[in-house]
């Protein structure tokens, strides 16, 4: 019997309509299954609940329809990728079988067989050209759409977590919860990037498409297994091993092989979750120590503290390396096992199918398609094994972000002084009690009222609770109770710390803080800077520098008074806000404050007797919770 004519493995004239139907059906089934699985993960797994708590508002918020539509489009891209891979396997089958038929025709002298093989070869090349264009187009669109989704999600989540961190002053009150968190800044910057990329423990890369993400990578793997199983099932024959016949041997071989390899991989890779989490935590702690040294460079230089700082940095760096060594050893074992498994299986389909090819039961193209299907099923079933370390790193990012969300919620839930707006622009403290973290009373219940234009100086020995009282009134200190009535409009009440906050940006931004720089004319800024003895800075308003390092502590405190004049509050609390100034300049600034804002209520914390004369009333904290409130003995100075 002579060689047979070439016959295409599928009817290519029906490939397009059949593919459209297949893609539509596969997308619908996949969407339903993915949604069901995500719901189950949400309710049945701890990390699913954590994931949902972090980003729930993005998927059920006002723009959620657009989010789900984008996910649907990305899922469509995944389904198209699988369908193209299936068609490529048939195209490869036709190409190799056509070559085989052409060679058989040449060898047998049968021109008809030869011509059928040649026509089949060029037909397969034409099919390949069309599919290659579709494949490249899909990949480019896939990367673009994936990046759009990731970027939009990251923008939203960064804003969401930043606002959550700022809301209710959680950024400060987090310090007082039982289990404090480390480096919230890194969690918002780095872990959000890892979280939204969804590719494992690495930040987003511009080349990432759906196949790079854990979710869509898993979906593509499952669809590929189902799609190529049908092909492999039809191409598999019976294998005899020690007299035992195994039908559909190729299919069962790949299932058993991958199952055993995956179980062993999970055993080897299990510690990677904790090692990845510790790697992030320890590196963040070391980075924070370096940042602190940079910010305190002048103080360290005065102390000649280089040796101590070096020792402290080394102490923090040593556990980074110790943990990383364990991480590397475990990763080498994990990756070594996966590589061995992947390399061992490469020749297996050829070895198993070779006897059937030599017996003429199948064509060469069938063997090639068998190897392609076998490889796709193996790679797809191995997805979870190969990406176990990526899942571990992604899980670590979820833990860290959930820790931030949880800490913010606990920080906001801590008790605080109840603040109410006053009807007459007065400041009134009702039953304000301040305690230490251990529960000891720091200030007994306190009642004070100041009307418009009134002033109060708070004095007492160090540790008596002066600054803590101001923190309590600012709703920062959680170990306090009582009610504070104060002017309640935006920026109608200001609190100034001893070392003013200097934000990043231009000098204009620094001086106008917390107001918008665009809302204040240059002439007003220059006039205000001149009044607080900072006239030399008037020509530097648009310079962008690290002003916290450029300005001296005294200049920073004068900037704080400039902010008061620009904001025009109705009440201001100052915590030793002139401690870096000489007595004369201190007096001048208080006189300026009273002349510019005569109706403003001024409450100051001070250690200087001279400052007491600039106020009408004095609250002296005596220690042990006791206090004394009385008019200032000397008549208040003209301020």
UniProtKB/Swiss-Prot annotation:
Coiled-coil ranges per UniProt: none
Alphabetically ordered keywords of this record: ATP-binding, Cell membrane, Membrane, Nucleotide-binding, Translocase, Transmembrane, Transmembrane helix, Transport
Bilayer topology annotation: Multi-pass membrane protein
Chain residues that bind ATP: 462-468, 498
Entry-linked PROSITE patterns: ABC_TM1F, ABC_TRANSPORTER_1, ABC_TRANSPORTER_2
Domain of life the protein comes from: Bacteria
Alphabetical list of Pfam families matching this protein: ABC_membrane_2 (PF06472), ABC_tran (PF00005)
Domain ABC transporter: 427-639
Subunit structure and binding partners: Homodimer.
Family of the protein in this entry: Belongs to the ABC transporter superfamily.
UniProt protein name: Hydrophilic compounds import ATP-binding/permease protein BacA
């Amino acid at each position: 019997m002579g060689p047979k004519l070439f016959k295409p493995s599928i009817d290519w004239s029906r490939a397009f309509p059949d593919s459209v139907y297949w893609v539509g059906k596969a997308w619908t089934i996949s969407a339903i299954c993915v949604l069901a699985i995500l719901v189950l993960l949400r309710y049945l797994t701890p990390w699913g609940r954590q994931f949902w708590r972090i980003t729930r508002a993005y998927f059920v918020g006002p723009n959620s329809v657009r989010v789900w539509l984008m996910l649907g489009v990305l899922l469509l891209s995944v389904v198209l990728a699988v369908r193209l891979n299936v068609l490529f396997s048939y195209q490869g089958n036709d190409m190799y079988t056509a070559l085989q038929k052409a060679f058989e025709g040449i060898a047998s002298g049968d021109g008809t067989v030869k011509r059928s093989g040649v026509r089949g070869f060029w037909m397969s090349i034409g099919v390949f050209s069309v599919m290659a264009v579709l494949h490249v187009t899909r990949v480019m669109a896939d990367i673009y759409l994936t990046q759009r989704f990731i970027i939009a999600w990251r923008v939203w989540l960064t804003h969401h977590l930043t606002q959550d961190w700022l809301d209710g002053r959680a950024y400060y009150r987090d310090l007082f919860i039982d289990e404090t968190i480390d480096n919230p800044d890194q969690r918002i910057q780095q872990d959000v990037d890892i979280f939204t990329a969804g590719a494992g423990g690495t930040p987003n890369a511009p080349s990432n498409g759906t196949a790079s993400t854990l979710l869509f990578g898993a979906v593509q793997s499952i669809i590929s297994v189902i799609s190529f199983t049908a092909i492999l099932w039809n191409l598999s024959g019976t294998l005899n091993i020690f007299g035992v016949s195994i039908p559909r041997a190729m299919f069962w071989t790949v299932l058993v092989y991958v199952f055993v390899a995956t179980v062993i991989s999970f055993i080897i890779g299990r510690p990677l979750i904790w090692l990845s989490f510790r790697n992030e935590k320890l590196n963040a702690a070391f980075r924070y120590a370096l940042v602190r040294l940079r910010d305190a460079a002048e103080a360290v230089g005065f102390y000649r503290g280089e040796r101590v700082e070096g020792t402290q940095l080394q102490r923090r760096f040593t556990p980074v390396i110790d943990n990383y060594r364990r991480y590397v050893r475990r990763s080498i074992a994990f990756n070594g096992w996966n590589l061995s498994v992947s390399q061992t299986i490469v020749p297996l389909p050829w070895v198993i199918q070779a006897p059937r090819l030599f017996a003429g039961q199948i064509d060469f193209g069938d063997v090639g398609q068998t190897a392609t299907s076998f490889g796709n099923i193996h790679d797809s079933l191995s997805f979870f094994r190969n990406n176990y370390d990526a899942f571990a790193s992604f899980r670590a990012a979820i833990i860290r972000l959930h820790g931030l969300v949880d800490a913010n919620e606990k920080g906001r839930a801590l008790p605080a002084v109840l603040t109410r707006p006053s009807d007459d622009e007065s400041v009134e403290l009702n039953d304000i009690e301040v305690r230490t973290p251990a529960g000891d009373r720091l200030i007994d219940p306190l009642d004070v009222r100041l009307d418009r234009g009134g002033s109060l100086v708070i004095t007492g020995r160090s540790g008596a609770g002066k600054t803590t009282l101001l923190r309590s009134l600012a709703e920062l200190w959680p170990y306090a109770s009582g009610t504070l009535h104060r002017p309640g409009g935006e920026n109608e009440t200001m609190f100034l710390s001893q070392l003013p906050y200097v934000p990043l940006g231009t000098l204009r931004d620094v001086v106008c803080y917390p107001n918008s720089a665009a809302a204040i004319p240059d002439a007003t800024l220059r006039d205000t800077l001149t009044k607080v003895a900072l006239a030399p800075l008037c020509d530097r308003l648009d310079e962008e520098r690290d002003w916290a390092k450029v300005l001296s502590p005294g200049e920073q405190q004068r900037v704080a008074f400039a902010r008061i004049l620009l904001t025009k509050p109705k009440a201001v609390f100052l915590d030793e806000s002139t401690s870096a100034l000489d007595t004369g300049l201190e007096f001048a600034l208080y006189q300026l404050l009273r002349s510019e804002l005569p109706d403003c209520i001024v409450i100051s914390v001070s250690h200087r007797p001279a400052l007491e004369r600039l106020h009408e009333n004095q609250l002296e904290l005596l220690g042990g919770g006791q206090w004394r409130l009385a008019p200032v003995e000397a008549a208040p100075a003209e301020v």
